[in-house]
Amino acid sequence: FRVMPIIDPGVKQDKKYKIYKEGIKKGYFVKNPDGTVYVNKVWPGDAVFPDFGREEVQQWWADNCKYLVDTGTAGIWDDMNEPASFEGEIPDNIVFSDGKYLSTHKKLHNVYGHNMAKATYNGLKKYSHKRPYVITRAAYAGTQKYSTVWTGDNQSLWPHLQMMIPQLCNLGMSGFTFAGTDIGGFGADATAEMLTRWIEAALFSPLYRNHASMGTRAQEPWVFGEPTLSIYRKYLKLRYRFIPFLYDLCYKETKDGLGIMRPLVLNYDQDPAVRTMNDEYMVGDELLVAPVVQEGQNTRAVYLPAGEWIDFWNGVEYAGKRTILVEAPIDKLPLFVKNDTIIPW
């Protein structure tokens, strides 16, 4: 196992807390218009917020990552960094910095999470001497240089499973290739069927992570017993078999900017049949994935674009530019390989 702690920007307002005392002494927290430090409530209770628009505050945050690196953490997960607060939205007129200039929360809100992710990345890079691994909830244009992202607090609902495919494809086309969702849903209670279909549907999402909120049904696969546990294990093993393939696609993305998960219209833009399709996706140019995203469904129609396609599970070949009906029992993800594809295995 590797440990990746969640770190929120909200610093506990506590005169005995070293980080708080340092930040107050150096004037590193965002302020009210009258110059006093702005306070709101988040997970530690009363909390203050680093002014990440200033380079010296980013460096201070980065230096405080050393403790986590020294204790053996494998990465850092930045959360609640819109910034979020428990007692209403942060007012627009709270003073945030934009470099050397004073500005407002209204103007700087969208880049707050970006600057936090950048600071976290630089801290890990400086002290771990390894390729940093950061996850962030809030992001902005360019954050992909510093962090992976996920789509936030979704729900254990079938429409949210359906939403996953266009969300991740759109992120990929926006430069955020390394992205994922909370598999199984974060809020509400997942069912065995929903969790199984979600772990199948997300098989090729770059960030592949089951996550659930406190107070909801536990979502570890063994909680649901069989056959959920065996199916879950099957797809985790399959995921590991595809890691070299996904790694190659990650490298290619750094060169050509094309995402790993892609809408079919990106690869087949002249095909009218795929222009509004949201329940299938491509993995690079080589794989076509057609997940089951409807409750109780054991078959589904799959549209195959131009070319020759091979059923991953049984080797049957199909000509493209047509729709086929495939069997999709609970343990099967409809998956097709483009003919003449070489997959590192």
Task: Give, region by region, the residue ranges found by the protein language model.
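Catalytic-domain carbohydrate-binding cleft regions of carbohydrate-active enzymes
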Residues: 1-343
